């Protein structure tokens, strides 16, 4: 490999690291900006757009970089903010965010068109919503019962206050969490498409 080619490759790697670091910092800040939607879903589940930077990273740098930003975001949050869930919430955020970003980036980078970007992002949001069911059912909610000492019946009761027919955890997750997670992903997709082009000079060399 020539010296110039080696230098160009190193410069590209440095640029990717810098962009990933910047997007991780932005994602970390966005984790603080969240709000409940109590009429639609229990108040302990909040809406945020902290998955947006990892989606940008997946498109601009590659699917693996989307996962890297997701990881760094949650590590920063756990270290600087602390955790009230024994890191269960951060683990859930990492798993679901990684599915979202990696899927979107993988599909986009196969053809790199606006259509593939949209297809990848929507597919990522849909897969994230589907994966949220086993992650919440087998990991997150049982862990919350242990960490907070709250009976599962009390958690289900919060869902039933909105929809009485949600009388078991699986019904709660399918009825509330899946559509909420999908719509949350679609919000990130919309914002990504609005800001990606203006940010392109920063994201790309």
For every predicted segment, state its role.
Residues 1-205:
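Loop-helix junctions at membrane interfaces
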């Amino acid at each position: 490999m020539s010296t110039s080619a080696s230098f160009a490759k190193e410069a590209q790697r440095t640029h990717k690291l810098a962009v990933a670091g910047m997007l991780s910092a932005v994602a970390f800040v966005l984790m603080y900006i969240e709000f409940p939607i109590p009429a639609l879903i229990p108040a302990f589940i909040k809406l945020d757009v902290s998955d947006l930077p990892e989606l940008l990273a997946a498109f601009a740098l590659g699917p693996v970089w989307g996962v890297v930003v997701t990881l760094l975001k949650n590590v920063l949050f756990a270290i600087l903010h602390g955790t009230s869930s024994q890191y269960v919430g951060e683990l859930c955020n990492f798993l679901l965010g990684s599915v979202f970003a990696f899927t979107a980036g993988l599909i986009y980078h196969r053809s790199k068109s606006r259509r593939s970007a949209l297809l990848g992002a929507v597919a990522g949001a849909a897969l994230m919503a589907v994966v949220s069911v086993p992650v919440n059912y087998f990991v997150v909610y049982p862990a919350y019962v242990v960490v907070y000492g709250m009976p599962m019946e009390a958690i289900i009761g919060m869902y039933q206050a909105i929809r009485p027919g949600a009388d078991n955890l699986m019904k709660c997750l399918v009825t509330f969490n899946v559509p909420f997670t999908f719509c949350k992903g679609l919000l990130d997709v919309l914002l990504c498409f609005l800001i990606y082009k203006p940010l392109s000079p920063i994201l790309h060399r």
